[in-house]
Amino acid sequence: MIVGTGVDLAEVDRIQRSIERYGDKFIKRIYTPGEIAYVERKANKFERYAARFAAKEAGMKAIGTGWRHGVRWQDFEVANLRTGKPTLLLHGVAARYAEKLGVKNIALSITHTAALGMAHVILEN
C-alpha cells in the first residue's frame, strides 16, 4: 500500500548558480559523498545535481515532514544499483520517519533535461 508520495522539479540554472557562487560549501551541505563522487565523474553534472536535489525534495514530501523535525538534505541519498537504476536511501531523521510509516519499499524515478531535474518518490509499506 502507498503510504507517501512526492514529486519535485529543480531548475538546472538555479542549482548551477548556487554551485558556482558557493562551491563546495553548497555541494557538501546538500549532497552525500557518494552522490558527489557519482556526479563529478559524469557529463552534465549540473543536470545530475538538479535531479538529485529534486529527489531529496520529493523524498521530504513523501515522508510528510518537509523541512520540519530535524530532517536534513543528507538524510536523502540517491544511489544507483548495478543495473544503473536509481534508488533513494534514507538516513538519520528521515529513516526514522519512514520506519514509523512502515516503509518497506521506496520507488524513485528521476530524469533531467538541460533546463530541469525532476523526481518522483513513492513509499510503500
Curated annotation (Swiss-Prot):
It is an enzyme of class 2 (transferase). Keywords: Cytoplasm, Fatty acid biosynthesis, Fatty acid metabolism, Lipid biosynthesis, Lipid metabolism, Magnesium, Metal-binding, Transferase. Its EC number is 2.7.8.7. It comes from Solibacter usitatus (strain Ellin6076). This is Holo-[acyl-carrier-protein] synthase. Mg(2+) binds at residues 8, 57. Its main location: cytoplasm. InterPro entries: 4-PPantetheinyl_Trfase_dom, 4-PPantetheinyl_Trfase_dom_sf, ACPS, Ppantetheine-prot_Trfase_dom. Its cofactor is Mg(2+). One of its GO terms (molecular function) is magnesium ion binding. The keyword RNA-binding does not apply. Belongs to the P-Pant transferase superfamily. AcpS family. Pfam families: ACPS (PF01648). Coiled coil: none annotated. One of its GO terms (cellular component) is cytoplasm. It comes from the Bacteria. NCBIfam families: acpS, pantethn_trn, PRK14660.1. SUPFAM superfamilies: 4'-phosphopantetheinyl transferase. It is found in: Cytoplasm. One of its GO terms (biological process) is fatty acid biosynthetic process. Transfers the 4'-phosphopantetheine moiety from coenzyme A to a Ser of acyl-carrier-protein. It catalyses: apo-[ACP] + CoA = holo-[ACP] + adenosine 3',5'-bisphosphate + H(+).
